[in-house]
């Protein structure tokens, strides 16, 4: 059987995609902050590494804050399999395990527990999380990708 050059190129392209584009097996994150943002993330960890519906996701963050935060807002956007499903805006200093004012300097917390609802569909979730300070200046920005499974 003879293959055309186009068929060979498509097969090679398909295998390259399989090798390069790996499925998300744990929580992955990237820093989408601007260089001028006041919080520089040094470490962001999630436990468990494989989020499971009906269980808590514990988030640990540490970094350096170059100015005091007296108040602020948090913005959260969640996408499920590329479909936007939720956008939230909230008070940074109320209900997030954070107490304001937050002093300038090294910052570390392991108190962020997020329950993943038991009925959440299994699949790939993309989260964009942006914080703003009392002057409406961006504090930091994080993009998170995770594959939530059922227990």
Swiss-Prot record:
Stored Gene3D superfamilies: 2.60.40.770
Keywords on record: Lipid transport, Signal, Transport
InterPro entries given in the database record: Ig_E-set, ML_dom, NPC2-like
GO molecular function, one term: sterol binding
Coiled coil: none
Signal peptide: 1-26
Pfam families reported for this sequence: E1_DerP2_DerF2
Annotated S-S bridges: none
Quaternary structure note: Monomer.
Job description of the protein: Catalyzes the intermembrane transfer of phosphatidylglycerol and phosphatidylinositol.
Record family assignment: Belongs to the NPC2 family.
Entry protein name: Putative phosphatidylglycerol/phosphatidylinositol transfer protein 3
Species assigned in the record: Dictyostelium discoideum
């Amino acid at each position: 059987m003879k293959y055309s050059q186009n068929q060979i190129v498509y097969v090679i392209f398909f295998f390259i995609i399989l090798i390069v584009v790996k499925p998300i097996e744990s929580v992955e994150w990237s820093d989408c902050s601007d260089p001028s943002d006041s919080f520089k993330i040094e470490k962001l960890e999630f436990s468990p590494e494989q989020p499971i519906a009906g269980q808590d996701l514990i988030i640990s963050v540490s970094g350096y804050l170059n100015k005091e935060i007296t108040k602020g807002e948090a913005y959260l956007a969640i996408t499920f399999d590329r479909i936007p499903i939720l956008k939230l805006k909230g008070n940074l200093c109320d209900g997030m395990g954070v107490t304001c004012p937050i002093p300038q300097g090294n910052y570390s917390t392991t108190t962020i527990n997020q329950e993943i609802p038991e009925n959440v569909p299994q699949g790939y979730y993309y989260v964009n999380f942006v914080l703003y300070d009392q002057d409406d200046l961006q504090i930091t920005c994080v993009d998170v990708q995770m594959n939530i499974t059922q227990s």
